[in-house]
Amino acid sequence: MRKNNTAIIFGSLFFSCSVMAANGTLAPTVVPMVNGGQASIAISNTSPNLFTVPGDRIIAVNSLDGALTNNEQTASGGVVVATVNKKPFTFILETERGLNLSIQAVPREGAGRTIQLVSDLRGTGEEAGAWETSTPYESLLVTISQAVRGGKLPAGWYQVPVTKETLQAPAGLSSVADAVWTGNHLKMVRFAVENKTLSALNIRESDFWQPGTRAVMFSQPASQLLAGARMDVYVIRDGEGN
């Protein structure tokens, strides 16, 4: 992928994203992790537990002490694990993209849990990497925005849960990340931006620039945000930005 000058892309982008838990079930627990890192996670020792790595597939489960009574891979790339242990133990998850995630399981009675292990996938995934490096830089940014808008992500790109993504908004504006899409070297984040003041504020895409930013897009053409109004701001970042 050839890096030219950073670019601001204009366009009307309309996206929607929703997450819903079925009645009577626990909502998924999102656990941020880094490759090679470890997390202490409470799991059920009376019901099965589901582990997933959004944007990746778990291909192996390793438990040296045999504490897992069962582990079964799902068609979607997750793994269902079960234990009757009462004491903490450790197991390792290996993924298709080359991640190794260490889980310090803390067993307890209760409903089975759904755990989403969210790791920064940038720098992994051969399919996304090949496409990103072979596409001219400006065309790459435009194609990513159009693909997400159309609901069909580029090859090797995935939507992942929000973790620590932030946006440095100008004075008077608040911002909250509500959706993330990631590839190999780049990721795209959607922020809900709101005018908290009692008057209209002038806004430009460049107002939302920060280290690692490669493109900023408004959900609709705008030069002002009215008092109390909200709009979506889409930011494409490289490996330097969160």
Swiss-Prot record:
It holds the Pfam family TraK_N. This is TraK lipoprotein. It is found in: Cell outer membrane. A lipid is attached at residue 17 (N-palmitoyl cysteine). PROSITE patterns: PROKAR_LIPOPROTEIN (PS51257). Involved in pilus assembly. Keywords: Cell outer membrane, Conjugation, Lipoprotein, Membrane, Palmitate, Plasmid, Signal. GO terms for cellular component: cell outer membrane. Residues 1-16 form the signal peptide. A lipid is attached at residue 17 (S-diacylglycerol cysteine). It is a lipid-anchor. It comes from the Bacteria. It comes from Escherichia coli (strain K12).
